Amino acid sequence: MAESRQTRLQVKCPTCQTAVVWKPENAFRPFCSQRCKLIDLGGWADGKYTVSGQTESLPEISEPDGAYR
């Protein structure tokens, strides 16, 4: 009953734009389903999405003596 008194926050699934209630029980939030979550993950893996900013080069690490070969 307490939930009915509160305003339920709804967001749109970033993948399919379906309305999703934002609540702890929704394991896929902000997505509506596991499928939409995996589609988004695939987009990141394919380079479809990026985070803007400067690229930093990583320091070179030399192999220690007796390295795995």
From Swiss-Prot:
InterPro entries: DNA_gyrase_inhibitor_YacG, Znf_NHR/GATA. Keywords: Metal-binding, Zinc. One of its GO terms (molecular function) is zinc ion binding. The keyword Hydrolase does not apply. It holds the Pfam family YacG. Zn(2+) binds at C13, C16, C32, C36. One of its GO terms (biological process) is regulation of DNA-templated transcription. It comes from the Bacteria. Binds 1 zinc ion. The keyword Lipid metabolism does not apply. Its cofactor is Zn(2+). Belongs to the DNA gyrase inhibitor YacG family. Interacts with GyrB. Inhibits all the catalytic activities of DNA gyrase by preventing its interaction with DNA. Acts by binding directly to the C-terminal domain of GyrB, which probably disrupts DNA binding by the gyrase. This is DNA gyrase inhibitor YacG. The lineage of its organism: Bacteria, Pseudomonadati, Pseudomonadota, Betaproteobacteria, Neisseriales.
